[in-house]
Amino acid sequence: MYFAILGTMSRTCVRAYAVFAIAIMVLTVAWFAFSISQAIQRNTVGAQQRFAQVIRRIAPRVTSKRQLTDAEADFIQNLCKNDDLIMALNIFSNRVQLFSWTYDDLMFVAGGGSELVPRSSSLFIKIFSGRVPYQAKDECLLFTAALRVLTPANIFFRGCVVFLVMLTLTISSMVFLVIEYLSVRRFQCAQGDARPRPAGPQGTARSRTDEAQVSPGTPPECPVSVF
């Protein structure tokens, strides 16, 4: 009865730990997906504000609606390169391209007019467009920019958290399995020792019993002949 209870407890512990480990993995993956989704929504608002700031910094420096000077182009290019969020920027004036810059030429293709067309759709990049009145109020500058709404640092941090949780869960699972294996082995050994051992041949058992009944020092009985 005792060993049966131990076996039942061992199986219950294994099942409980399996449920616990699966729940931790599911919750970790769900947290990663949820946090990424929340970060994208939150950073989209921040990227839109950054785009508005970039427009306000660039628009006053554009002195010609036909062509930018070298100083103006260098200023805008350095502004884009030093910004971690800007992936591409186009500036048009009456469908005349004044400026075009991309972080990676392989990420975007030429679209109609002033459009920025990504080669592949991505949840991490958003396209923003805005118009700013030029010197004459009937004319305007058209800005189109692609901004990152999730930086590699954000993904790396969340990935590290998931990795550490999975690593801890893996190590704890290995330790649990080793402890459980040793417990099962001890249980099997104890169960084997508790089993009754088979008796030997009946003759041998009887002779040992007879020998045990004869006290030491008692002379053997001799047969008495009757005349």
Curated annotation (Swiss-Prot):
Biased composition (Pro residues): 217-227
Entry annotated with the keyword Cell membrane: yes
Membrane topology: Multi-pass membrane protein
Keywords carried by this UniProt record: Cell membrane, Membrane, Transmembrane, Transmembrane helix
Gene Ontology cellular component terms for the protein in this record: plasma membrane
Region Disordered: start-end pairs: 192-227
Spans through the membrane: 13-35, 155-177
Subcellular location: Cell membrane
Protein's name in the database: Uncharacterized protein TP_0173
Organism in which the protein naturally occurs: Treponema pallidum (strain Nichols)
